[in-house]
């Protein structure tokens, strides 16, 4: 039986990063909404509990989310983060006030008290000998009086109680966010909590996950047939391989050509899955169906819903041909769930995801989502462990709605054709340009292997079609044609991302090729927005 950490979600948009950091330490963790019952908490079998941040204020009184009382009575270690710290303080007899100075962004925190959690963890030491941590803050309220039994663990000039600890009861809390990459020692702090404070062993790994997931799929599905929408992207590909490992020929993959695929996508998918892996794949041409329903629709949410709805309809028609088809499998992963504020979330919806937001209540198939609790990097590791080709697994992610969310405004076949060719040029140039580190660029992958080229060095790169025209000059003539934006980001978990610092020469080559080779485009721009504030996809 694995050790496991229970994470209670109070609505932070980065709650799942806590789970990611715990898993990085080799310990299994799951996220549940804060309002689970005391009975659930008592029966879960947690080795420790982490309370996430959230958008609410404990000062709101009875209206504010509260920690289940059983959490404080279990006798296992508890760590509160941001709102989790404030809720812990208020419920255990401390006081919280609305801070006069709000703290959002980088901060330097002084450690106090030589606690078991922070002992020997620091980024630098002041001339006075104080250990300091470089952290990320995001709060307005703050604790102004600690509960009985707690001592000061960390402080900043604007937040005198930035961390507190009750070592006897093994309760700890921070006002800053150790789960985000901006907190330099965050990973070490969480590892210390789960290993040293909670006593967990590093006993959660991908081979074990595969064995457990395969068994779970078999129990869930039984002798039923499963159909899966195969896009050729990383998530659906790994989901297909995992499900095929579990139930073999009970899985049928449905590859839908909706006219919004990348260049030569259909050919590649059929060769890879049907011929190389022996998976049952049905190729359906539904271009007219999708384009017809998308005509005149420009709202991003409406487009996503339509594309999701039409996918489901295609699957239902296909399922009707199979008497035993009872399940619709999807490659939904954790970031999809988080941004849709789906099941288990108390956060605010950012945008609907094709995998989790477009399914009507009339769906006649049950959902099978074997990757729902995994981050993107974990999905890739799973794919490699399942024996999928490295280049397939480490291919950049592609959204379920395809180019439909990369064409701003109304989707037209003409726009899709232009974008497909521009995107292919961008990817080709990234692949053939050797990687040389530039300021702000990561020099190696997560496993320490140096990047071969700029495609490897970026986590996701693509072109976006802008439905606006600009004036240009080609030869001796005036042009009035469309604009394409290039987007490339670097990230570990797709929850936050930095724009990729691509070499100017590379960008110049891409721009020249697109303008010269794609008739109908005369201007190329580069997106230098991070996430947040922007999302990775434009729609």
Curated annotation (Swiss-Prot):
ATP binds at residues 231-237. Keywords: ATP-binding, Glutamine amidotransferase, GMP biosynthesis, Ligase, Nucleotide-binding, Purine biosynthesis. Residues 4-203 form the Glutamine amidotransferase type-1 domain. The active site is at 82 (nucleophile), 177, 179. Residues 204-395 form the GMPS ATP-PPase domain. The keyword ATP-binding applies. Gene3D superfamilies: 3.30.300.10, 3.40.50.880, HUPs. GO terms for molecular function: ATP binding; GMP synthase activity. Pfam families: GATase, GMP_synt_C, NAD_synthase. It catalyses: XMP + L-glutamine + ATP + H2O = GMP + L-glutamate + AMP + diphosphate + 2 H(+). GO terms for cellular component: cytosol. Pathway: Purine metabolism; GMP biosynthesis; GMP from XMP (L-Gln route): step 1/1. Its EC number is 6.3.5.2. It is an enzyme of class 6 (ligase). InterPro entries: Class_I_gatase-like, GATASE, GMP_synth_C, GMP_synth_GATase, GMP_synthase, GMPS_ATP_PPase_dom, NAD/GMP_synthase, Rossmann-like_a/b/a_fold. The keyword Repressor does not apply. Homodimer. HAMAP family: GMP_synthase (MF_00344). Catalyzes the synthesis of GMP from XMP. This is GMP synthase [glutamine-hydrolyzing].
């Amino acid at each position: 039986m694995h050790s496991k950490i229970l994470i209670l979600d109070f609505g932070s948009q980065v709650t799942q990063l806590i789970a990611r950091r715990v898993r990085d330490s080799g310990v299994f963790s799951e996220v549940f909404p804060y309002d689970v019952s005391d009975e659930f908490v008592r029966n879960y079998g947690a080795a420790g509990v982490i309370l996430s941040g959230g958008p609410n204020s404990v000062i709101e009184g009875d209206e504010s989310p509260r920690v289940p009382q059983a959490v404080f009575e279990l006798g296992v270690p508890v760590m509160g983060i941001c709102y989790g710290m404030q809720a812990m303080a208020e419920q255990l007899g401390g006081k919280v006030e609305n801070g006069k100075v709000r703290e959002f962004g980088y901060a330097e925190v002084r450690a106090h008290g030589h606690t078991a959690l922070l002992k020997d963890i620091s980024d630098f030491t002041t001339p006075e000998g104080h250990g300091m941590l470089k952290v990320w803050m995001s709060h307005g309220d703050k604790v102004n009086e600690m509960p009985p039994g707690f001592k000061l663990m960390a402080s900043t000039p604007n937040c005198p109680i930035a961390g507190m600890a009750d070592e006897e009861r093994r309760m700890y809390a921070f006002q800053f966010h150790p789960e985000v990459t901006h907190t330099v020692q965050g990973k070490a702090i969480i590892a210390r909590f789960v290993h040293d404070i909670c006593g967990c062993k590093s006993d959660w790994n991908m081979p074990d996950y595969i064995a457990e997931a395969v068994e779970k799929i078999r129990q869930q599905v039984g002798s039923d047939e499963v159909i899966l929408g195969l896009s050729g992207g990383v998530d659906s590909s790994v989901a297909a391989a995992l499900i095929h490992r579990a139930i073999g020929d009970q899985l049928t993959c449905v590859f839908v050509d909706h006219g919004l695929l990348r260049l030569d996508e259909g050919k590649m998918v059929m060769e890879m899955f049907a011929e190389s892996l022996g998976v049952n794949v049905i190729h359906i041409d539904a271009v007219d169906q999708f384009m017809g329903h998308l005509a005149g629709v420009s709202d991003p949410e409406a487009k996503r819903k339509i594309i999701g709805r039409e996918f489901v309809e295609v699957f239902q028609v296909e399922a009707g041909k199979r008497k035993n088809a009872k399940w619709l499998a999807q490659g939904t992963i954790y970031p999809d769930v988080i941004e849709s504020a789906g099941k288990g979330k108390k956060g605010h919806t950012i945008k609907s995801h094709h995998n989790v937001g477009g399914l009507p209540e009339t769906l006649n198939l049950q959902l099978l989502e074997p990757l729902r609790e995994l981050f993107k990097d974990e999905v890739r590791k799973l794919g490699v462990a399942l024996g999928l080709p490295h280049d397939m697994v480490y291919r950049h992610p592609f959204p379920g709605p395809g180019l439909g969310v990369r064409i701003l405004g109304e989707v037209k076949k003409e726009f899709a054709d232009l974008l497909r060719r521009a995107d292919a040029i961008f990817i080709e140039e990234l692949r053939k340009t050797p990687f040389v580190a530039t300021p702000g660029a990561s020099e190696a992958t997560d496993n320490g292997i140096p990047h071969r080229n700029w495609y490897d060095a970026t986590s996701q790169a693509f072109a976006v079609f802008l439905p606006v025209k600009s004036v240009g000059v080609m030869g001796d003539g005036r042009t009035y044609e469309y604009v394409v934006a290039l987007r490339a980001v670097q990230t570990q978990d797709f929850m936050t991302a930095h724009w990729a610092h691509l070499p100017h020469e590379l960008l110049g080559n891409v721009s020249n090729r697109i303008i010269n080779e794609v008739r109908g485009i005369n201007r190329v721009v580069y997106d230098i927005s991070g996430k947040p504030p922007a999302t990775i996809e434009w729609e």
